[in-house]
A protein has these predicted regions:
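Extracytoplasmic gate region of multi-pass secondary transporters
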Residues: 1-33
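Multi-pass alpha-helical transporter architecture, strongest
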Residues: 153-184
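Structural signature of the two symmetry-related core transmembrane helices
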Residues: 57-72
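A membrane-interface helix-boundary motif in multi-pass transporters
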Residues: 136-159
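Helical-face signature of the major facilitator-like transporter fold
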Residues: 4, 70, 78-90
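Intracellular juxtamembrane helix-capping segments at the cytosolic ends
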Residues: 95-108
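A late C-terminal transmembrane helix in Major Facilitator Superfamily
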Residues: 110-143
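Helix-to-loop junctions at the C-terminal end of transmembrane segments
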Residues: 42-55, 138
Length: 184
């Protein structure tokens, strides 16, 4: 659910924030297509990654990349900052799903389909929770800008937490070297 929360808050509200930060800019309608371009690039790149190692490191990296995209947009609410943030947010989007599904196949080969449904539902819970959370932040802060900033900080924090959980899992439950990933 952390990836769903991090993605939906950013993808939904970053264009709104950009409109407030860059009023009248002719590039405002380009942020969604840039995110889509990042998704396409990420989808192509993720299929080129060898699936022989511990995918939890790749999942952590994807979470960190999305958190970085949010941080850049917060640190630099400028045209270059929003361009970078939009494009980079999209890059790990499909890779997260692809790597997570491969990890499910490794952990639960006999019941992978059920677990894939479960993680999809959990991702959806994060997506559902995001917009109401933003609404609460907007009501509880002094300005709309402060509410959006806090919401994006929470989204980035959720992604960093998700990455740290994956890294913690690699230490707590290392892959068994006698049964390495087979490259499925």
């Amino acid at each position: 659910g952390l990836a769903g929360l991090g993605y939906i808050v950013t993808a939904t509200f970053l264009p709104v924030i950009a409109r407030a930060a860059l009023p009248g800019s002719p590039f405002l309608d380009m942020f969604w297509p840039l995110l889509g371009l990042g998704v396409m690039v990420g989808a192509l790149l993720s299929t080129k990654v060898p699936l022989t190692g511990d995918l939890r490191y790749l999942l952590a990296g994807c979470y960190f990349i999305q958190a970085l995209s949010i941080a850049v947009s917060l640190w630099s609410p400028t045209l270059p900052g929003f361009i970078f943030g939009s494009f980079v947010l999209g890059i790990p989007f499909t890779a997260l799903t692809f790597f997570a599904m491969q990890e499910v196949r490794r952990l639960r080969p006999d019941t992978a389909t059920s677990y894939m449904g479960l993680i999809t539902a959990v991702y959806g819970v994060g997506q559902i929770a995001g917009p109401p959370m933003v609404a609460v932040m907007l009501r509880r802060t002094a300005t709309v800008e402060a509410g959006f900033t806090l919401s994006l900080e929470i989204a980035a924090g959720a992604l960093v937490l998700g990455a740290l959980i994956y890294l913690w899992m690699t230490r707590m439950w290392p892959m068994n070297p006698s049964r390495p990933r087979t490259g499925t």
